[in-house]
Design a protein with these regions (language model features):
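Phosphate/pyrophosphate-binding catalytic cores of soluble transferases and nucleic-acid-acting enzymes
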Residues: 1-257
Length: 257
């Protein structure tokens, strides 16, 4: 079967990605209205309720009647990862197709987008609670950087991709190596080589660096004026800690530090 025939059999999907403040949100809405699409957020922080200012979350009135998926679906004390995103995004895409619409994936979390596009198999190994507890205790006693250096020794690619403060992900990568003797980064890379089940169009937005920096600085000023510090305090009161997944977003962890 030729490439054109294969593409014709696949369902269409559009991806809009790019750096912060480049204009993904506005363009995604314009495009959705023009082609009859619905938007799937690929932002790892906008899934959380009560985190509106620091995530620059789109407001209801800004959606302009376009349905948005994977926004405000979890409490900030809940974990969210690529496996969960993949399952939810797949379901959202099928829901959109069922109405004869086209999914538009918008956001800046590249690994999440790849997980959806290439149907990556995140093999779930048996949990080793003893190992996890040992790693958690090590992080608590000696600091997150100790675990991160341990990961760097066995899987430098994963260490490069995972921030040291994201202790849960660091431990999962170490656990995968402990259980299988293989690097989880190698497993994920092999999965990314798969053929996509979608006929997708992938657009990376960009603009002049000076303009982009000016927009980012303006956005930060607006966030502070709108009450970002108070938002973080409220999240702390709800039980969010420095190592909570929801607190790994830019702005939140800096204020907590």
């Amino acid at each position: 079967m030729g490439n054109l025939e294969q593409a014709a059999e696949k369902k269409p999907l559009i991806v809009l990605t790019g750096p912060t403040a480049v204009g993904k949100t506005a363009l995604s809405i314009q495009l959705a209205r023009r082609i009859g699409g619905e938007i799937i957020s690929a932002d790892s922080m906008q899934v959380y309720r009560h985190m509106d200012i620091g995530t620059a979350k789109i407001r209801l009135e800004e959606m302009d009647g376009v349905p948005h998926h994977l926004i405000d679906i979890l409490e900030p004390t809940e974990d969210f990862n690529v496996v969960r995103f993949q399952a939810l995004a797949r379901a959202a895409a099928e829901d959109i197709y069922s109405r004869g619409k086209i999914p538009i994936v918008a956001g800046g979390t590249g690994f999440y987008i790849q997980a959806l596009l290439y149907d990556i198999d995140f093999t779930q190994i048996d949990e080793n609670m003893q190992f996890r507890e040992e790693m958690e205790r090590l992080a608590a006693e000696q600091g997150a950087e100790v675990l991160h250096e341990r990961l760097r020794a066995v899987d430098p690619e994963s260490a490069e991709a995972i921030h040291a403060n994201n202790v849960k992900r660091v431990i999962r990568a170490l656990e995968y190596y402990e259980q299988t003797g293989e690097k989880i980064s190698a497993h994920n890379e092999a999965e990314r080589a798969k053929i996509s089940p979608y006929h997708f169009f992938y657009y990376v937005l960009n603009t002049d660096r000076t303009v982009l920096y000016e927009r980012i600085e303006k956005r930060i000023d607006e966030m502070m004026e709108e009450g970002l510090v108070e938002e973080v305090r409220q999240l702390q009161a709800m039980g969010c800690r420095h190592d909570s997944v929801a607190m790994q977003g830019l702005g939140y962890k800096e204020i907590l530090a």
